[in-house]
């Protein structure tokens, strides 16, 4: 979704975007020309978990508003961004959940969970597949995010528990993973603050930031994207009983029950949660309204600061490349002649699906007392995707400290 002019120049803008996200070898003058011409690419996906129904219902309304609204703010979004929307990440599961819900509306089972998985091969864990990319839906998303478009910004819309805040926005809570560029974590604060402000402006209560969901977690798309230099985030909307509203009494609203660094020990006002929702009826329309505001606010912020976002994208790519060039370890050598060559080929393919550059040696290489044959794979850290390479191929240890 974009302006008619941008859509007419889509192939050129995609090529410009590819150079912005990987500016190696470009002069400063060339980079500045690309930034002047480029558009911010924003991707948002909905209802990866099929039982989290509201985002897919919101998607059609979001698209309609963007293509019909004549307000200046919407025009700025269309002129300055290219919006890639995945309205339903798991359409088969969405149909299953819808059919189950409709079958039992008006019975004692209305709004209950299905007694089988809404994804045949992985259930709820499709949100853990952004690094292995075993599922066809994950492969499709990886093609968009890591090879064909490489957006500057990604947001994934989810649902969470019923008896707490109404909406979570980034930044994530502590701790953070070590391999993202520091600008990523600043940008998450930047986007999250703007979305939270716009929600408060719209009179929507119960929005929390910097809590509950940590910055070191499984490698779903909204986490692994950060190590690709894509500012990647999620929203989490309070759940209802699928499409059936529920009534939440004030005494049912609670924090996480402990003074942890998840940053919500109690359900009462605090700096990242200044306007608690008091309770009452809660249903899909409430969920859609806040997701619409958050989605549009993200797009508007990217459009408003188009050049800054693109400059940051260049800076993140160059910084990560430079860090890789200066590290003690230049990269990873992977022998092709191991006892299980098919698994080697699978590993290399997984890395290629991430858009990682991989080279092969022309001759034998002797290193550290080991001789590697010609044709050995070399995954250099001297590239913009250094963060994701280190996240996938190095050992990392969750901090054994206050976090």
Locate the predicted segments by residue.
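Short, conserved secondary-structure transition motifs
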Residues: 78-97, 382
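Aromatic- and acidic-residue-enriched carbohydrate-binding clefts of CAZyme catalytic domains
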Residues: 107-125, 267-271
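Aromatic- and acidic-residue-enriched segments that line the glycan-binding/catalytic groove
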Residues: 97-109
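Hydrophobic positions within alpha-helical membrane elements
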Residues: 52, 95, 161-163, 241
């Amino acid at each position: 979704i974009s302006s008619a002019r941008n859509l007419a120049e889509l192939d050129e803008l995609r090529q410009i975007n590819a150079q912005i996200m990987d500016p190696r070898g470009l002069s400063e003058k060339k980079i500045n020309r690309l930034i002047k011409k480029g558009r911010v690419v924003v991707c948002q996906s909905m209802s990866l978990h099929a039982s989290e129904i509201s985002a897919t219902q919101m998607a059609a309304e979001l698209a309609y508003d963007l293509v019909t609204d004549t307000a200046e703010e919407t025009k700025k979004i269309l002129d300055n961004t290219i919006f890639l929307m995945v309205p339903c990440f798991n359409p088969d599961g969405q149909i299953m959940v819808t059919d189950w819900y409709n079958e039992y509306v008006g019975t004692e089972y209305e709004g209950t969970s299905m007694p089988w998985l809404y994804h045949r091969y992985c259930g709820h864990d499709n949100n853990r597949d952004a690094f292995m990319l075993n599922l066809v839906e994950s492969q499709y998303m990886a093609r968009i995010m890591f090879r064909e478009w490489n957006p500057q910004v990604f947001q994934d819309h989810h649902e969470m528990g019923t008896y707490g805040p109404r909406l979570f926005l980034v930044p994530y809570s502590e701790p953070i993973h070590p391999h993202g560029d520091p600008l990523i974590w600043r940008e998450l604060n930047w986007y999250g603050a703007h979305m939270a402000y716009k929600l408060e402006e719209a009179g929507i209560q119960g929005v929390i930031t910097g809590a509950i969901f940590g910055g070191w977690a499984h490698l779903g798309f909204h986490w692994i994207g950060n190590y690709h230099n894509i500012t990647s985030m999620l929203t989490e909307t309070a759940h209802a009983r699928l499409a059936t509203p529920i009534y939440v009494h004030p005494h049912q609203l609670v924090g996480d029950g402990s003074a942890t660094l998840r940053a919500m020990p109690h359900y009462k006002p605090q700096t990242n949660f200044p306007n608690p929702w008091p309770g009452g009826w809660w249903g899909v329309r409430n969920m859609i309204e806040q997701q619409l505001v958050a989605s549009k606010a993200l797009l508007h912020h990217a459009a408003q600061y188009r050049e800054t976002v693109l400059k940051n994208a260049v800076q993140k790519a160059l910084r990560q490349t430079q860090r890789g060039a200066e590290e003690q370890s230049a990269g990873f050598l992977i022998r092709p002649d191991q006892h299980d060559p098919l698994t080697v080929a699978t590993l290399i393919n997984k890395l290629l699906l991430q858009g990682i550059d991989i080279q092969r040696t022309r001759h034998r290489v002797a290193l550290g007392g080991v001789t590697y044959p010609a044709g050995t794979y070399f995954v250099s850290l001297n590239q913009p995707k250094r963060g994701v390479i280190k996240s996938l191929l190095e050992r990392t240890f969750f901090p054994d400290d206050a976090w």
